[in-house]
Amino acid sequence: MSLHTRICDIFGIEIPIVLAGMGGASNPELAAAVSNAGGLGVLGAATCRPDELREWIQRTRELTDRPFGVDTLLPASVRKAPAGGGAASATSPSPADQLPEFKRFTTEFMEREGLGEFPSEDDLRKKGFMEDLGALFSKEVFEGQMEVVIEQKVPVYAAGLGNPGPWVDRLHANGTVVVSVVGAVRHARKAVESGVDVIVAQGHDAGGHNSPVGTMALVPQVVDAAGDVPVLAAGGIGDGRGVAAALMLGAEGAWIGSAFLAAEEAGIEDYQKKALVEANEEGTVISRSVTGKPARLIRNSWARAWEESDFEPLPMPFQSILAGPVQAAAMRQKRGDVAPGFAGQGIGMIEAIRPAAEILREIVEGAERTLEGAPGFQRGAG
């Protein structure tokens, strides 16, 4: 048998499996590898500046002639950056300086972990944290990314967070398929009303920003709410059995991220990939310590320190600015126990660092075996 659903026809692909647009990890090399293997590769462009996104799109087109997508964030609650660029300009104080207790907390954490001192405001700007992290999570940059997606006539666009409704008409005019990632039935209904082509039902099991509702419970409810709009299941799907289960729940394919994090082509460091291979099903935690919004990430001392403190994380983008120096210092020292990385509960199924095509092929073969065996659970008429 072969896996084929409406998703294949809508995206122009052979297999109804989509690489989730994971920031940093889902780079042109990984996206192209998944597309070349018959699935749909999606660039994780949340932290790309518009000009960098343009380069990523062009690089992906050099690596594949098959359909691919771009995933960005469209959060409604992000504050607008002040005139002059960046969430904190040269004349505006940093969030850490506005809230000295947060700076003190972070400074003590860095010293305790042997990560050096918390950078001064001038150092932060010199190293790009104030500009890069502050401006990246701004309304202006999100809108700039969308203009590049439209300019480049990307085959598929996915809103990893937020409602793409205001952009649907312009995207459709380009022939772009529009995908909306949702974590609640009400969001699915709103996405349908907005005219999206595909919905991703992303449950609590997923890495990154996700839903408070588990994947098994969320998917069928979103399928019912979506009507004729096809649904991809996401969250904790790490092998072919998960894909088969998603299809049985009414989804027409799977949106898979963490299973590809240890792919040879993935844009994360080797020490991070090795940590994923060694992880188990209990290796993740929900935390607001990185972006200010709830997200599932690999257990680490930064998230634990926030959980044990009396502080409420700052709103986006200020929490990212505060966490930036910690992440950068931890990555320089290759401290996977400190540097937070997004990942889902399916990481316990990651067994080795392998090519993306091999991972995809194994998932497909596993799904086919599972579906072929499903009739055996039915009782005979006699």
Where are these regions (language model features)?
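Conserved active-site-proximal phosphate/metal-binding subdomains
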Residues: L30, A88-M110, P212, A217-L232, ...
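Residue-level detector of alpha-helix initiation sites
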Residues: A25, I237-G238
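Active-site entrance/lid segments in N-terminal catalytic domains of soluble metabolic enzymes
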Residues: M1-A226
